[in-house]
Structures are given as C-alpha cells and as structure tokens.
Amino acid sequence: RYYIQVAQGETLANWPEERLWDELAGRFDGISEQGVTRGPALEISIAPLRSYVFETMRHGRLFLAGDSAHIVPPTGAKGLNLAASDVAYLSDALIAHYRRDDDAGLTGYQAKALARIWKAERFSWYLTKLMHHFPEDGAFEHRMQIAELDYVAGSEAMQTVIAENYVGLPL
C-alpha cells in the first residue's frame, strides 16, 4: 500500500494510474536499488488526513462504535483496531448486562473506549505530522519535523515507542 500526499481539493481525475506510478518512482529514485515495480492498482482513492472524536458514545440505549464515534487519518493504521476494541468492550458489556444483569460495563463503556481512542488518535496524529507537510506549516514547523525524524532515526527508545503504538495498544 502506498500513500501520496496531494493538495486539498485534488480529485482522482487528476491522478491517473500512470501519474501515480511516475510520482512513486520519482520519490524512490536513489533510495531503492530495485526502484518501483509497476503493476495494476487494486484501489486508488483520496483519503483525507483528518481526525475526529465524538466524545458522547452513549445516548440512552444507543452506543456508538468505530467510525461513527471516531475518525483517524490512515497514517497510523488505527481505524480498524479502534473499531474492533470498541466492539470488544461493548460486547463484553452487553453480555454482562443480559446474562448477569450487570450494567457496570455499559456504564463504563464510554470512558474505557475513549481512553484507548485518545491514545490511538495521538499516535495517528503524531505520525501524520511526522510524515506529511501541511500548506499552513512554515519554516519552523518544517525544521521541527526534520529534527523529529532525525531523532526517531537515531533513538532506539523512540523507535520502540513507535513500534509499540503501531502494533497496537493492549485491550
């Protein structure tokens, strides 16, 4: 899977498959001896780099989970993980409610889910800011980004933090 940052407002009509391959080849030129192996694209889409958390995940008997409650940018690959953890928390709570008349899980669902959601949001946004340049960023932000990339490249501790978050936090 490859991601190429495009300007806000771009459309797929501006990015035929050949242009995507040319852009990737240009970016990998000099980095990889093999270059880019071209082939048919399975999917081409534009994914907005946005985050959102709807902090009210329960209204009476209605519970929100997954994308209805939170959106993360694709950079951190956390969307499906968060949806699965929401469903795991909620299913445990519903089972306890219907089998044992225990509502503690339903009462605590929102707080428990949000604690994990905000950690994943933080990580996804960190990676997004680390890997992407935004038009509103100035010279200072660009230098900070380069300094952070340099720090990550040279710090085993920071690489461990990124790996732990990328693999996924425990339920």
Predicted ranges, named:
Residues R1, A13, R61, A113-L114:
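Short, cationic motifs built from Arg/Lys/His that form the positively charged side of catalytic pockets
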Residues A84-L94:
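Extended, folded domain segments that form the structural surfaces/walls around functional sites
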Residues R1-A47:
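Conserved FAD/dinucleotide-binding core of flavoprotein oxidoreductases
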Residues I4-Q8, S68-A69, T75:
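Short, histidine-centered active-site or binding-site loop motifs used for metal coordination
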Residues P74-A84:
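A conserved FAD-binding loop/helix module that cradles the flavin
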Residues A47-H70:
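FAD-binding beta-loop-beta segment adjacent to the flavin cofactor pocket
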Residues G30-E33, T75-A77, D92-L171:
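C-terminal helical "tail/cap" subdomain of flavin- and related membrane-associated enzymes
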